[in-house]
């Protein structure tokens, strides 16, 4: 199972949100590059990065910071936030990212998703931000009436390399992930899932690992690292 430490970037800073609420945002001292370096030096090789400015504005405004990380650290990065066009996807892949995460654009333009999956094989991940079973878009500002299960079924044969499933009700709360819903949804399709939102302890990580579920590819850990609830060296032992 892959453990993805997270870096969320807004206004060139590392931040975390609670339940996707930008009014409940905490900024942290370390720069995104310094944080990535800490992860790298601790033994992590897979990093989850979200450009929150990009998610809100529909275009990446922190790309130079992310490219600095790519250039200087030997990391496999999955990048999301503001990726809405084929050019966006192409630019990130040329920059050297491992996976490009499509969220809003994947849901609003399913033909685009199909096209990029065909063109960039095994490079496209889809981020599903889910609240009460329904997908949210645009940095969680827009709630839809599209059910997560219906959407996942629709894209099952496109060639999506992984689905990042975030339960917005759990995200940033450190109250434990929504393992039940993620496992249930992942069992219905052939696409690997990554669990995101609410990880609060090493115990949560061990619980997910103990499932030994081939449909669960990994887990994203964010706020609990920044707040010191999970120590990096302890998390590294779970790699």
Each model region followed by its residue ranges:
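Glycine-rich, proline-tolerant flexible connector loops at the mouths of alpha/beta enzymes
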Residues: 46-64, 104, 109, 165-175
